[in-house]
Amino acid sequence: MEKVLVFGHKNPDTDAICSAIAYAELKKELGMNAEPVRLGEISGETQFALNYFKVEGPRFVETVANEVDNVILVDHNERQQSANDIESVRVLEVIDHHRIANFETSDPIYYRCEPVGCTATILNKMYKENGVTIRKEVAGLMLSAIISDSLLFKSPTCTEQDVAAARELAEIAGVDADKYGLEMLKAGADLSGKTMEQLISLDAKEFQMGNAKVEIAQVNAVDTNDVLVHQAELEKVISAVVEEKGLDLFLFVVTDILTNDSVGLAIGKAANIVEKAYNVSLENNTATLKGVVSRKKQIVPVLTEAFQA
């Protein structure tokens, strides 16, 4: 049987990795030769979850057409966030919870996108719909994805469905969601030992906003100053990325997991759009974004609207 690769976006977060593992397992149970892979490095937060539940991480691939003809996307759909040669393969399915943009196919596909906080929440339903029992380890990874995407249920993207799914999965996994979740988030917020290049690419996504090319990277921290003390070095590597990719804006968002506020570092010719979007003034290229924790709900749509205004 021909193999199908299942993967999340570039610079994968916990949902991208864990949902690829969980959905590949469901597809295998349903008779497909599916393998989860990843398009980037595994973050400290994700590695904590993999280690905790004793699951091996997916292997890394840069291209997919050299291996398979068919793929399944989880936790993304936008072409620039996917495999470099995504146009050379057939996308069979998409399971996602983001906006739909820069995506089209030549054939009809199974496309499931729901306005929930995490892809794993959708997968929890799909396991039940197909009558497949979720293994303890996989339940733990799916729980980890929901905790990560919802910032332990504090993000405005978090829905009642996410909370209910997390409670169900925690029971299967045999953990206390709140206690385990805080441990996992703290592991993810430990940025010691990371280079500046790693910091700005840990969780970075590229977007087309009107005519503007924008990249938004986000890291969680227990104290934003632990990251911003390196601002001069950060600006240097961000400026290099802006030039290399021809970006109009690179927004580096440092989120405090204790206060649920963020600081944005904006570099590029369109940095003023951040001021316009949030009614703030950039001082030394930074501004505090009160109550902003979600790139999907509080940054991407707000900036997109500001660029198109």
Swiss-Prot record:
Q: Identify the cofactor(s).
A: Mn(2+)
Q: Provide the catalytic activity annotation.
A: diphosphate + H2O = 2 phosphate + H(+)
Assigned EC number: 3.6.1.1
A cellular-component GO term for this protein: cytoplasm
Cross-referenced InterPro entries, in alphabetical order? DDH_dom, DHH_sf, DHHA2, DHHA2_dom_sf, Mn-dep_inorganic_PyrPase
Q: Which molecular-function annotations from GO does this UniProt entry contain?
A: inorganic diphosphate phosphatase activity; manganese ion binding
Detail which positions bind Mn(2+) 1: 9, 13, 75
> Cofactor binding mode, per the note?
Binds 2 manganese ions per subunit.
Q: Where in the cell is it found?
A: Cytoplasm
One Pfam family this sequence matches: DHHA2
Q: Which UniProt keywords apply?
A: Cytoplasm, Hydrolase, Manganese, Metal-binding
- Which SMART domains did the record assign? DHHA2
Asked whether the keyword Hydrolase is assigned, the reply is yes
Report the superkingdom from the record: Bacteria
For binding Mn(2+) 2, which residues are annotated in this chain's numbering?
15, 75, 97, 149
Please name the PANTHER family in this protein's record.
Answer: BNIP - RELATED (PTHR12112), MANGANESE-DEPENDENT INORGANIC PYROPHOSPHATASE-RELATED (PTHR12112:SF22)
Protein family according to the UniProt entry: Belongs to the PPase class C family.
- Its protein name is Probable manganese-dependent inorganic pyrophosphatase
Q: What organism is this sequence from?
A: Bacillus cereus (strain ZK / E33L)
Q: Which gene encodes it?
A: ppaC
